[in-house]
């Protein structure tokens, strides 16, 4: 297999099954653009998508109940989906399966730290030179299996680091704790978070990061007058608020 040329420089959303996948629905409903959407496992049964990443063999879903609640959804997907579904082996019962390019990925990045399906999807995006990666539902907050949560998150963040070092823009759902995204800005820098005037990081319009004291940061948003909704939206014209552009 060769990298997919049409993905070079494009914006791709990877959607997993964590709680922050609801942020994907919010993003879509407010016009956020994705050139492609990649579904992780059973998310493919819920949202529109262009590709599925399912690194478990199809037999796990077709011949056992080992996948728990995902089993029925994934069995249906495996039997009926036309693909592409990237996985570890082909199965005659499943028309859409494509073998993941594991040889090419390991050779390209000289790395085989791949302990979960999301990491494989990120590595694939990096291999295809995707320009922007937006992650939703990639949370690794499994209370019943903390070891899996910690090891999976570590692997995903490792690959995100590799992607960012190669120039890829990475964005994480606001409600996800991946890359400490949901942590308040003045609590992200360990040690400095204990100071009376903690350090915060802000990005300029060129996406260059700068360090400020919290006291230096001034909000550019003016306080808006509180308004009540009416059926003619006359208050929006009066206060020049209009429909929000950012959420």
Name each model-derived stretch.
Residues 1-247:
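Metal-ion/cofactor- or nucleotide/acyl-coenzyme-handling active-site neighborhoods
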């Amino acid at each position: 297999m060769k990298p997919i040329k049409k993905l070079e420089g494009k914006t791709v959303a990877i959607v997993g099954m964590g709680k922050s996948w609801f942020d994907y629905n919010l993003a879509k409903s407010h016009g956020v653009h994705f050139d492609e959407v990649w579904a992780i496992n059973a998310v493919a049964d819920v949202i529109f998508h262009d590709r599925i990443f399912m690194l478990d063999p199809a037999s796990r879903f077709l011949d056992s109940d080992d996948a728990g609640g995902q089993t029925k959804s994934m069995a249906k997907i495996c039997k009926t989906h036309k693909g592409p579904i990237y996985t570890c082996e082909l199965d005659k019962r499943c028309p859409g399966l494509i073998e993941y390019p594991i040889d090419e990925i390991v050779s390209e990045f000289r790395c085989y730290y791949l302990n979960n399906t999301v990491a494989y999807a990120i590595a694939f995006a990096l291999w295809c030179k995707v320009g922007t990666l937006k992650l939703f539902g990639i949370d690794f907050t499994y209370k019943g299996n903390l070891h899996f949560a910690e090891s999976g998150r570590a692997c995903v963040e490792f690959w995100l680091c590799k992607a960012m070092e190669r120039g890829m823009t990475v964005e994480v759902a606001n409600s996800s704790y991946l890359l400490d995204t949901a942590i308040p800005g003045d609590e992200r820098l360990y040690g400095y978070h204990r100071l009376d005037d903690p350090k915060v990081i802000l990005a300029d319009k060129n996406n260059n990061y700068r360090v400020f004291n919290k006291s230096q940061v001034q909000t550019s948003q003016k306080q808006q007058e509180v308004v009540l909704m009416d059926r003619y939206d006359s208050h929006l014209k009066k206060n020049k608020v209009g429909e929000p552009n950012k959420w």
